[in-house]
Amino acid sequence: RLVGKPVRIFIYCMGAAGGIAAFAGLGALFGGSAGLPRFDAKHTISWIQWAWFLGIVAAAILAGLCYLFFAKVSEKLGEMLQNHRIVSCVLAGICIAAGMYFLPLTTFSGEHEMGELMSSWEEYSAKILILTALAKMLLVNLCISLGWRGGSIFPLIFSGVAAGYAFAAITGIDPNFAVAAMTAGLYGYVSRKPVMTVAVLLMCFPPVYIFPLAGAAVIASKVPMPSKMHEEEKNCR
């Protein structure tokens, strides 16, 4: 590596801060948002929420393992079809169509669908929310491995939001707290960069969420990955 860890952290923070400032400035001048909907600053943080905190982080790590498993399987499939790019891209399209039919919120990258989920998540069962999160992680890995263009950051955030709402539906805790901790834990575990995780998520979470965001991202990023999955997490860096 050309620079040390403190310099890299500084670069990540400055890059994220610059991006947030640019989005905020453009939004103030021309209207609109930064692409990701923002959660309300009003939320409940009490001992009840924090009593579930480690459980949320554990669930986020489990979701991260599912993401890495999907990435590994998708990569193997992509290698099998790398000389048949038209076939692989058509196959990815069929997978997206199937996902859209059974779980409509899994379409596209997730920014718009995240806004829909924020306003209507109580209409879905915890089972559907969990399936939506898992399907989103599977589909984004299939698309990338089978030749489609794009990245996994926004889909991963959406998956964390869906899984967080599922956790809130099961336990009855404050949904925004659950979503913040779940999303930060999932993203932090996969990316292994807690500072960058918090900086990116502050694009859709107000600063009052800094403690569950930072706590979940740091704890999850310190949990070791299975040795065979180290390469897969680089796709989310």
Predicted feature locations:
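Alpha-helical transmembrane segments and immediately membrane-proximal extracytoplasmic
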Residues: R1-R237
